[in-house]
């Protein structure tokens, strides 16, 4: 008996089936709002577009809160950082197979003309934003008929499942055993109004699938005989506590906090950054005297909106330390967002950063990108296996996959390609002939940036050599000299440099 049979046989008249369909996994209940914030942050939509992700002030009126939501602004750092990852990971990806049908499928994996690389970019973007995303490898239940059958062969197609759409799941020692996702109701005509509250359900286990409409009625059911659930879960950072979900690249609550700080700054600047014109009058001034002052101001200054007290005229301004504190907190949150992505928002001076700190920063980012590249490699091969499970029923999918000789190669180096550009920039600076002192400092910084992982004693020795060098000792090395010396140092430490053999 499959894991979804209970829902199929449940009575719909009593509402039991719909109640079971609406049931969600406890982990889903715990993380759902956080996942939605992450997805909204990546696309700049949802609560970041409507202002719903703003936190109301303790004593804020409904009108003031609505006004603040209307004026809210969102700076999309999440999209910028995630797209940086996508560009690095999906550049120069190579695919090979002896199966021409698979090659054709790679050019259109969703039935809408989307190539495999673009599809995976979209799935990975959602996974990085929210922590995980699913990809359903589905197939039309019946083969196409009619004159176009030869041109439109039946073949699998991919569907991205956002984490907020995967309502429930079961995992055992073999992996994913069953999954329940929510899906939109079929598209209606332009003259009808769509109801976003009306969604259906799609269920899969290792033997069958079933689809239910928004009322809970069974609309379709079938047996797929794959022996596996055709859903692959992409988790860039797997959760340590939950085997099904992952962790977002950037904590969504931090992005939401930054969004709120921007709104709070606007409130302070708009409603509190003002000057109050104060006119002081003598203590013995009468009401007539005060009215005379108002008329005089209206005629001479152009305003009668003033505060009148005893003394001399003055401007009183609000204390702007609050705005400065909010802005400083925004800078801190932005730096934290970049730090979570293993990047630096503001590069401190080279002298302020230790060689160990720079080395660890580069190493951390490089290792993160490498692990993601390995993940994408394995994920894409898993997608190819599900493709052959559909194309060769009867448990022959793995054999067909092996015969196809599928190979996928993702980039494995992410920092070394910048070496030549770094060398050229520093060599050009040295060649400016800025004088002995400036040239020595430039050379120190060049070594510091190009070789951040040197041992402290080695870095100290190099620094002393540069300090002790005289003007005629090759301080103004040309670009080729500097390039060759840096390459030799890297090779001495076992680091291979592209093109070094030719040099």
Q: Whereabouts are the PLM-identified features?
A:
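Extended, helix-rich architectural segments
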Residues: 1-158, 480-484, 488-503
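Polar/charged side chains located within well-ordered beta-strands of beta-rich proteins
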Residues: 7, 17, 194, 199-201, ...
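Extended, regular secondary-structure scaffolds
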Residues: 127-240
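C-terminal helix-loop subdomains that flank or include functional centers
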Residues: 292-305, 332-503
